[in-house]
Amino acid sequence: MGEMLSRLEPLYLFNEDDRANDLVSKVNFDPSKNIAALLSQEELGLIEEVWNAPQGPAASGWKSGLLGWLLDTTNGQLSYGQTEYANYFASAKDKNFFSPKVRNTFTAGVGCAVLSADGYFLVQQRTEGLLAGRRLDSSAAGMGVVREGKLDFYFEIKEKLKRELNLSEEEVKNTLVPTGIHGAADYLSSQATWKCEVALSLEELMAKANPKFIGRVHPVGKDDLPDFLIRHYVLPGNEPEKSLIGDAVGVFLRALDVDAREYAIGKMNSDGADICFGVFREGKFEEHL
């Protein structure tokens, strides 16, 4: 990671008053809008250098596929242009080397809060070597990949649940519901968020975790989730394994009921977080006061 900033970076909860199901089902993808138009030659060179570094993504066999780039959350739909994973990886890893325009972009992703049959949310600790290595994350998460010219967040979250927790569509389809969309400035990502309940005990669910992506699993009781978020939404310092990334906080906040969410946000903001509500209009955040 690049130099960590001295305070928590903003977490924007978009379109709080809109029905999440309507938003996530109305996705407009325009491939003619490309984030490359914002990048200078120097930034393009840095992206190539980071991607092709010894022991970097290319050397590890990663592919720089097409991803969604958030443009707008207004007019009853989500609008995206396109970027590539190499662009996202370099800018999220070392934001300080990029222009303010690039630092204010959000690349599409998905994240899910999974609740076990015996009442525990699963919080995962990412493995070493991933972009958010050793940090605490939601139950399952990943990028919003453009497939056959389309962004399909329902497909993406099912793919991530299968990839990271070996949960089949049959196991999640009856309870998997969208909860909203956010923008997390720490890793320049905008996740469409989901929650689901599974007919598996915590022990059974933990046994399914894929060690390629998940280093460790933390069970958090349903009623304990607000205080867990408050305690662990802190700067990573020398203990990244105790620090939630912004995306995870966005996912779990949207899994809470309104009163619990308001309590958690109020306490986190008083402790130094910057969580706010609004919309993303033509590439800029507009706060709802």
Enumerate the language-model features and the residues they cover:
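N-terminal leader/linker segments that precede catalytic domains of diphosphate-processing enzymes
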Residues: M1-S138, M143-E159, L167-L289
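Juxtacatalytic substrate-recognition/specificity segment
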Residues: K162
